[in-house]
Amino acid sequence: MTDTKIIPIDSEHNAIFQCLSGEKGTEDVKSITITASGGPFINAPIQDLQHVTVEDALKHPNWKMGSKVTIDSATLVNKCLELIEARYLFDLDEKYFDLVIHPQSIIHSIVTYIDGSSIWQMSSPDMRVPIAHALSEVNRIPIEFKDLDFSNLNLSFQEFPSDRSKIQDIAREVCN
């Protein structure tokens, strides 16, 4: 075993890492919530998805990402891959992880502890934020970013769509 430390860069995993920072480990974790914007089709009936084009799928409402990740986001595949990654990265059984839709992409992950408290990591949907944290870890470095306007901030959450749960079931099976 080495003293090597893995510092995640992906926004959700970096958020979990930050929420766990200062804790003695994961033994007091009750659950971890990983958020998903849901992509451009989250409110579209599943039967309508057979008519979407690649161009439609590449129009992510919040994030600027490469084509593959944007398509994976539109299909919710990326969230399932993130579930698998989080399970192994944080060495917790998949049952600890919940996936929820958060269309605004402001809350990146939530760690809830056994005492009922929750720590949320939030920032504008900008990959420079988790990358800067990963590069500096202990000493935060200044970057240009869009401030959150808390007086006009609306946060909403919804359950992972049941008509799209098959992909999540597969991801959970892979974790076991």
Residue ranges, per PLM feature:
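Catalytic, metal-anchored helix/loop core of enzyme active sites in primary metabolism
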Residues: 1-176
